[in-house]
């Protein structure tokens, strides 16, 4: 079959002085960073949905891209053509992983039986493509939010028959992910929330969602899937309020239903923006709670109240994110999935490469800067100094539960405590970070 991207062989690393827009300037897969290949640190993935499924339509306009596989025709044949182009893209871009929703790769069909049969055929196609290319599946998931049946949610739907349909999709998608060697399975509750409390039973919906997640965990163990289950937090859109608002909210939910040891988090940069947080905050929070799993690397727009899903281009922001990830030991089963799309006006097919190349260079440069911060150790040293009092006898007695509130009140009076505030030196530390960014 003729190549779709016929004007490009493969994207290659050419160094920072290259002016070739279809070459990497900073991402060198084989470059060693802290003793590990850059490719192994970053674990890049391209997503099926934004890259090959979105046709450029938005709230105010029809599709603008005119991709060959988005034309009228036999649904399975078009899905196979889309898979051909997708794996050509993955190969030429040098991404080791990809991600999908079930209906990204397979036609949904007119019935549950058609859905299952279509998906089974496409899983065989994908398995063959993976074997030919060496590209692996980072994670799979089920789209339980687009079809009108999910207008009031999937697991939180007031109709148990809708709940059951969603369960079928998740079973099918998880088993497909398992068959394809996927390293994670993602649960994003696109409509697991509410539009108004006037018709919503919050307690009931939380119980439904909790039971659904428990069943997902049960099925994972039943089929022997060894990958990581991931929830992807998002505060709103398409619903007004979603139950997986942010990392801290999801932690509380998991604790409520006894799932905190079974499920981790897939953190998306743009979702952090919508929740009123920095990307850095959400990553650091997930790590602090022991829930860090994977990343959807993109960016939002603080001036817009929706999920713009732009490609990451801020080295400053992502250097701090990669610093937190490296300090925590790096990715295990997770990676950096580009949940990002070209703009509607970017209608040239090679714009898909420009977006991903820039994003991969951004994250590669961020990784190298983060590695410098790790090797220098100055930030860690400053934080250790700031909290050093907790290593004292008093600090350790408090943390080990050896002193009560009344004991502390007595201690403070007996020792005539008069602590003096120590400077946080925020400005100096910001200058230090700029030194790593611009002077190293």
Curated annotation (Swiss-Prot):
<feature type="binding site">
    <location>
        <position position="307"/>
    </location>
    <ligand>
        <name>Mg(2+) 2</name>
    </ligand>
</feature>
<comment type="subunit">
    <text>Homotetramer.</text>
</comment>
<dbReference type="InterPro" id="IPR001998">
    <property type="entry name" value="Xylose_isomerase"/>
</dbReference>
<keyword id="KW-0460">Magnesium</keyword>
<keyword id="KW-0119">Carbohydrate metabolism</keyword>
<dbReference type="GO" id="GO:0005737">
    <property type="term" value="C:cytoplasm"/>
</dbReference>
<feature type="binding site">
    <location>
        <position position="296"/>
    </location>
    <ligand>
        <name>Mg(2+) 1</name>
    </ligand>
</feature>
<feature type="binding site">
    <location>
        <position position="309"/>
    </location>
    <ligand>
        <name>Mg(2+) 2</name>
    </ligand>
</feature>
<feature type="binding site">
    <location>
        <position position="268"/>
    </location>
    <ligand>
        <name>Mg(2+) 2</name>
    </ligand>
</feature>
<protein>
    <recommendedName>
        <fullName>Xylose isomerase</fullName>
        <ecNumber>5.3.1.5</ecNumber>
    </recommendedName>
</protein>
<keyword id="KW-0963">Cytoplasm</keyword>
<feature type="binding site">
    <location>
        <position position="268"/>
    </location>
    <ligand>
        <name>Mg(2+) 1</name>
    </ligand>
</feature>
<feature type="active site">
    <location>
        <position position="104"/>
    </location>
</feature>
<feature type="active site">
    <location>
        <position position="101"/>
    </location>
</feature>
<dbReference type="GO" id="GO:0042732">
    <property type="term" value="P:D-xylose metabolic process"/>
</dbReference>
<feature type="binding site">
    <location>
        <position position="232"/>
    </location>
    <ligand>
        <name>Mg(2+) 1</name>
    </ligand>
</feature>
<feature type="binding site">
    <location>
        <position position="271"/>
    </location>
    <ligand>
        <name>Mg(2+) 2</name>
    </ligand>
</feature>
<dbReference type="GO" id="GO:0009045">
    <property type="term" value="F:xylose isomerase activity"/>
</dbReference>
<dbReference type="InterPro" id="IPR013452">
    <property type="entry name" value="Xylose_isom_bac"/>
</dbReference>
<keyword id="KW-0479">Metal-binding</keyword>
<keyword id="KW-0859">Xylose metabolism</keyword>
<keyword id="KW-0413">Isomerase</keyword>
<comment type="similarity">
    <text>Belongs to the xylose isomerase family.</text>
</comment>
<feature type="binding site">
    <location>
        <position position="339"/>
    </location>
    <ligand>
        <name>Mg(2+) 1</name>
    </ligand>
</feature>
<dbReference type="InterPro" id="IPR036237">
    <property type="entry name" value="Xyl_isomerase-like_sf"/>
</dbReference>
<dbReference type="GO" id="GO:0000287">
    <property type="term" value="F:magnesium ion binding"/>
</dbReference>
